[in-house]
Structure formats: structure tokens, C-alpha cells
């Protein structure tokens, strides 16, 4: 048994879903201490409450996207990140160092969260980075439009800020272009899929499923309401229906049932949800936010794979949704090639297990006779 500290970005639910999958495997044999914020803290504190004695969830301050008039505000988001780095990151690192020492952590794992990597580095604890965002650094993105390539270069600097000195770097993505020169050490895996997804049996129902982020413009709801099929929307809370659109509170079990049973998705363009959809063979019309470059990149790769299409969230119309629905058969061949074949969970568990084995061997290795053993990270 080992002691593993895990941190993750609290924005949205993709990071939380990915880490939830890992922790479900790790808690069988290890003690796990989780650090997160916002949406992820809400989800994980409930998921690993009573009945999970080997998992503890701690709330920490985190960085969130900033919105103005319902749209992602890149400049305000950057300013908020810089303010977090200047005012909160240092004290948080000091706090986590104390908690790592008290916990006697053997390994740290992070999904795009900046404090734990720094605390682990100072404590000499090996770090495994498992996230989606490292594709901005490691992947050959020459196939994207030049504007998105520029955005990837710009955003890659934030990845450097978040994660320092990782012993192992894993990129989890539903797409897999070649690695850039100098990044051959990165391990590419598919999305990390929770047990409920891998055990779900897909069927083709007579409704659409949609997961939308807060600040979704009402025009997008109107487009869904006039698409010709019932639409179940998650992510915006429970509220009165709008035409054929019904709104549902987040319920993980019910959401998976609807994902497995829907005809298709018209949804936000997060890596995790796209991966879950592809695993179940569901075509997807992604709705990236105009200013959200990562969502735009995910959408381009989805389209290039032939498994779906995309429309800007701010511009989607009922006609665009109906056109997508009329062409669902066009996506069947590509979906058949990935359905049930993209889960990367086992690959990540092997990497973590290997790192723990290396640490255990280093801890029990006899010291050279000529000099005493020195504490330090296991590499």
C-alpha cells in the first residue's frame, strides 16, 4: 500500500471525471489525498464521501475562467491567473508541503493544477502529470488552422506555469497526432473512462443529449428547441422546459444512461465528453465557444476523424442542428473504428504502478558502502 496525493483543476467537470476514474482504481490498494476546487470539489467530495475510507478530499483555491456578458473573457482570465499566482499560489504551496509531510506521500499526481507539482518538487516526491492540456506542448498541431496553432503556442506557456518537473508526463486525448521533436518521452493515451461508461450498453433512442457550460447564450437553447427532436440538457441546472428542451440536474448515473441511449449529442467540446461519446459510438455536434481555443482544437480534431462536426456556440442555429441530424449516417464508418477502443485508463494505471515500484525499489536499495544514503526523489 502506498500514499498518493492527487490535485486537479476545478474548472468544469472533465478534470474531475478523469481523476474520478483513476481514484476508483487507486483506492483499492492505496490511500489517496485529493486537492481540488470549484466544480471538481463539489463532484468529488460527494463521490468519495461515506464508504470510501481510503480517500480524503480537500478543498483548495483554484483558477477559474472569467466571463463577460456570457462570453469567455480571455484577458480577464489571464489577469485572474496572474493574480492567483502572485497572491495565492505561494501560501498554498506551503500548505500542501505540510500536508504532504503529514500524509507521508509516496507519489503525487496532477491534472493541470499548479500547487501540488511545486510542493512535491520541494519535498522530493515524484510527480506523474496526467492531463489533456499538455497536447499544446507535445503534439504536432500543423494540421490546425494557423490561428489555432498560434493560440496553442500562446497557451502552452500556461502549461509550463502549471506543471513543473514531472517524472512522467501523460497526455489523455481522444485524438493522437504525432509527437513533436523533443517530446518523445510523453505517453499518449485515450480518454480515461469511468466504469459506468465502459459497462454501458449503447442503444439509439429518439432524443438528443446536450451538456452545456454555464453562460451558454439563450440563442443556443432556442436552436436546440427547434431541431425536431426532444433534447435533454445537463449542466445548466433544473429549470422549466423550453419547447422540446428539458433541463436536468447533474446526476451521474442518469447522465450515463442518457448518453448510452441518445441518438446523438449536441454539446460542449470538452475532451472528456467527446471521448465518452466516441467510446459509445455516438456522433457529436460540438459547440465550442469562439474564444475557447482548446475547445476549438478539440472540435477540429473531431471533424478530422469523421466522427462528428462542430458549430460555434454563439452562432449555432436550428438549421445547423437539423443538417447535422440529417447526416448522422455519414459518421457511422469512422465511429465503428473507435467505438469501445479508446479507453486509456489501464495505460495510466500501468505508468503509476511502475513509478510506485521504482520508488519502492529505491527506498529498499542498500546504500553504497563508501557514503551514507541521501534522501531524494525516486526517478
Per-region residue spans from a language model:
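Conserved nucleotide-sugar phosphate-binding/catalytic loop shared by glycosyltransferases and other
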Residues: 10, 28, 33-86
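Active-site-proximal region of nucleotide-activated glycan assembly enzymes
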Residues: 126-188
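A short, glycine/small-residue-rich beta-strand->loop->alpha-helix junction that serves as a flexible
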Residues: 7-20
Amino acid at each position: 500500500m502506498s500514499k498518493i496525493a492527487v490535485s486537479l483543476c476545478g474548472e468544469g467537470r472533465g478534470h474531475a471525471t478523469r481523476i474520478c476514474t483513476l481514484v476508483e482504481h487507486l483506492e483499492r490498494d492505496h490511500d489517496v489525498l485529493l486537492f481540488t476546487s470549484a466544480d471538481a470539489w463539489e463532484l468529488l467530495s460527494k463521490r468519495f464521501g461515506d464508504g470510501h475510507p481510503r480517500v480524503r478530499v480537500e478543498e483548495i483555491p483554484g483558477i477559474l475562467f472569467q466571463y463577460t456578458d456570457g462570453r469567455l473573457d480571455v484577458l480577464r482570465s489571464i489577469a485572474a491567473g496572474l493574480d492567483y499566482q502572485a497572491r495565492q499560489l505561494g501560501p498554498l504551496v506551503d500548505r500542501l508541503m505540510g500536508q504532504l509531510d503529514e500524509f507521508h506521500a509516496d507519489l503525487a499526481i496532477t491534472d493541470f493544477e499548479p500547487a501540488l507539482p511545486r510542493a512535491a518538487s520541494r519535498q522530493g516526491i515524484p510527480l506523474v502529470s496526467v492531463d489533456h492540456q499538455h497536447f499544446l506542448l507535445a503534439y504536432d498541431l500543423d494540421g490546425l488552422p494557423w490561428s489555432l496553432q498560434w493560440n496553442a503556442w500562446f497557451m502552452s506557456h500556461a502549461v509550463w506555469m502549471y506543471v513543473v518537473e514531472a517524472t512522467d508526463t501523460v497526455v489523455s486525448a481522444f485524438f493522437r497526432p504525432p509527437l513533436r521533436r523533443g517530446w518523445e518521452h510523453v505517453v499518449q493515451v485515450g480518454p480515461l473512462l469511468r466504469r459506468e461508461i465502459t459497462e454501458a450498453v449503447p442503444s439509439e433512442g429518439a432524443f438528443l443529449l446536450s451538456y452545456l457550460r454555464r453562460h451558454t447564450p439563450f440563442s443556443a437553447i432556442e436552436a436546440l428547441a427547434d431541431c425536431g427532436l426532444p433534447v435533454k440538457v445537463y449542466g445548466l441546472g433544473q429549470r422549466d422546459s423550453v419547447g422540446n428542451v428539458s433541463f436536468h440536474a447533474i446526476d451521474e448515473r442518469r447522465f450515463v444512461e442518457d448518453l448510452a441511449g441518445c441518438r446523438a449529442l449536441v454539446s460542449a467540446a470538452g475532451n472528456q465528453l467527446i471521448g465518452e461519446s466516441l467510446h459509445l459510438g455516438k456522433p457529436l455536434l460540438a459547440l465550442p465557444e469562439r474564444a475557447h481555443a482548446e475547445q476549438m482544437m478539440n472540435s477540429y480534431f473531431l471533424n478530422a476523424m469523421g466522427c462528428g462536426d462542430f458549430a460555434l456556440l454563439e452562432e449555432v442555429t436550428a438549421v445547423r442542428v437539423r443538417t447535422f441530424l440529417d447526416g448522422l449516417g455519414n459518421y457511422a464508418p469512422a465511429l465503428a473504428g473507435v467505438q469501445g477502443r479508446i479507453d486509456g485508463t489501464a495505460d495510466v494505471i500501468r505508468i503509476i504502478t511502475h513509478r510506485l515500484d521504482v520508488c519502492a525499489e529505491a527506498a529498499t536499495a542498500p546504500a553504497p558502502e563508501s557514503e551514507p544514503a541521501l534522501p531524494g526523489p525516486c526517478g
